[in-house]
């Protein structure tokens, strides 16, 4: 089974992430940031990953450290669960609409961290959640999962819809990329022979 459990303890946050890449979308989320839990639920359900997240952090200051460190820890868990990358599809992409909003996410398990994030949020907050933290979550993820990730909100008016379509598309693209290809069961998906 492709599973991982990762803990991250700093002076700012204490985080545990448990992940099953071949799950059914079950989730148990307690990040301490309610809107982040809502977005993590999108990743789990649309990626069909079993995901548990427990986090405590210095949210009395703001949510920055918790959101970023959950992204870091999730990235580490994905990298650990994938292992040597043999047999994975490697690339994934998804378009997701929600009413007036449309977002696209493309991912490559290249081993080269890179993030292109183009989401022109229409307001600064969704409830109490600072939408600027969305890029911090994904930056933490890519740097520790070792992926190239392109995120584009093509259109949208409602900032909640912008966030939600991004996270749903991310879950679906991630699911596609980590899917095992039985035709390439024991091979690395690269002409270099390594990723």
UniProtKB/Swiss-Prot annotation:
Its EC number is 4.2.1.19. It comes from the Bacteria. The keyword Amino-acid biosynthesis applies. The keyword tRNA processing does not apply. Its main location: cytoplasm. GO terms for cellular component: cytoplasm. It is an enzyme of class 4 (lyase). Pathway: Amino-acid biosynthesis; L-histidine biosynthesis; L-histidine from 5-phospho-alpha-D-ribose 1-diphosphate: step 6/9. It catalyses: D-erythro-1-(imidazol-4-yl)glycerol 3-phosphate = 3-(imidazol-4-yl)-2-oxopropyl phosphate + H2O. Belongs to the imidazoleglycerol-phosphate dehydratase family. This is Imidazoleglycerol-phosphate dehydratase.
């Amino acid at each position: 089974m492709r599973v991982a459990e990762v803990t991250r303890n700093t002076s700012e946050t204490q985080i545990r992430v448990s992940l099953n890449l071949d799950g059914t979308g079950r989730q148990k989320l307690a990040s301490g940031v309610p809107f982040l839990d809502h977005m993590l639920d999108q990743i789990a359900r649309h990626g069909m990953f079993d995901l548990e997240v427990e986090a405590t952090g210095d949210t009395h200051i703001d949510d920055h450290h918790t959101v970023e460190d959950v992204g870091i820890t999730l990235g580490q868990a994905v990298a650990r669960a994938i292992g040597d990358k043999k047999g994975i599809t490697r690339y994934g992409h998804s378009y997701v609409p929600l009413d007036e909003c449309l977002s696209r996410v493309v991912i490559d398990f290249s081993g080269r961290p890179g993030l292109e994030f183009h989401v022109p949020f229409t307001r600064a907050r969704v409830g109490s959640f600072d939408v600027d933290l969305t890029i911090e979550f994904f930056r933490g993820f890519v740097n520790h999962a070792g992926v190239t990730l392109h995120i584009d909100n093509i259109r949208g008016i409602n900032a909640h819809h912008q966030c939600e379509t991004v996270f749903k598309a991310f879950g679906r693209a991630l699911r596609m990329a980590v899917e095992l290809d039985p035709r390439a069961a024991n091979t690395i998906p690269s002409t270099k022979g390594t990723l």
